[in-house]
Amino acid sequence: MVRKTKGIVLRAVRYGETSLIVSVFTEDFGLQSYIINGVRTEKKNKETSSLFMPASLLELDVYHHEQRGINRIREAARYKVLHSLSEDVVKNNIALFMMELLFKSLKHPESNLPLFHFCEEILCRLNDGDRESASVFPFYFSLHLPHFLGFGISSPEKTIYD
């Protein structure tokens, strides 16, 4: 069944000569793996393979089956272009750190809308912010991620650092 969802690319791994296996944190299904055949051929333009770079915000049409470990993507397009993340090396590395931390933290394919919207917002803020303020994002993301996973600091009267 074809379903429409938004997703954040966490990682892409080459598979065979022309394919990619992409881990995507989706709005509706949580962490999912998708195989994209023929994306790395010479006939395809480079823009198609660049869609699946980590920290890309995509709108996806996917063939979703609950029982399968790896599904297929019918169509993918960016719904928010993050130019600054791809051009600035510092911001790119910060985004890669956050995507890797998120990938290592998510183990089950379950939807987590607040976490998805938090990640989407923090990537947009990192993209729109200046380079000097970018150094705060890894700490901010690391401190707030546990809250969305169910074991964060919840006491308002205690500070994080005493």
Model-derived features with residue positions:
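Non-catalytic alpha-helical scaffolds and adjoining flexible linkers that form interface surfaces
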Residues: 1-19, 25-162
